[in-house]
Amino acid sequence: MEVNDLGFIATILFVLVPTVFLLILYIQTREETES
């Protein structure tokens, strides 16, 4: 299965961006409930 660099980067960003976004939301809400 051949994957060009642009498609590979796009796939990584497509997975990474929502994951980071959810992590930030999770950490923020957890800090609010702890304090």
From Swiss-Prot:
Its main location: membrane. GO terms for biological process: photosynthesis, light reaction. The keyword Thylakoid applies. Belongs to the PsbM family. InterPro entries: PSII_PsbM (IPR007826), PSII_PsbM_sf (IPR037269). It comes from Crocosphaera subtropica (strain ATCC 51142 / BH68) (Cyanothece sp. (strain ATCC 51142)). The gene is psbM. The chain crosses the membrane at residues 7-27. It is a single-pass membrane protein. One of the components of the core complex of photosystem II (PSII). PSII is a light-driven water:plastoquinone oxidoreductase that uses light energy to abstract electrons from H(2)O, generating O(2) and a proton gradient subsequently used for ATP formation. It consists of a core antenna complex that captures photons, and an electron transfer chain that converts photonic excitation into a charge separation. This subunit is found at the monomer-monomer interface. The keyword Ribosomal protein does not apply. The lineage of its organism: Bacteria, Bacillati, Cyanobacteriota, Cyanophyceae, Oscillatoriophycideae. NCBIfam families: PS_II_psbM. GO terms for cellular component: photosystem II; plasma membrane-derived thylakoid membrane. This is Photosystem II reaction center protein M. It is found in: Cellular thylakoid membrane. PSII is composed of 1 copy each of membrane proteins PsbA, PsbB, PsbC, PsbD, PsbE, PsbF, PsbH, PsbI, PsbJ, PsbK, PsbL, PsbM, PsbT, PsbX, PsbY, PsbZ, Psb30/Ycf12, peripheral proteins PsbO, CyanoQ (PsbQ), PsbU, PsbV and a large number of cofactors. It forms dimeric complexes. Keywords: Membrane, Photosynthesis, Photosystem II, Reaction center, Thylakoid, Transmembrane, Transmembrane helix.
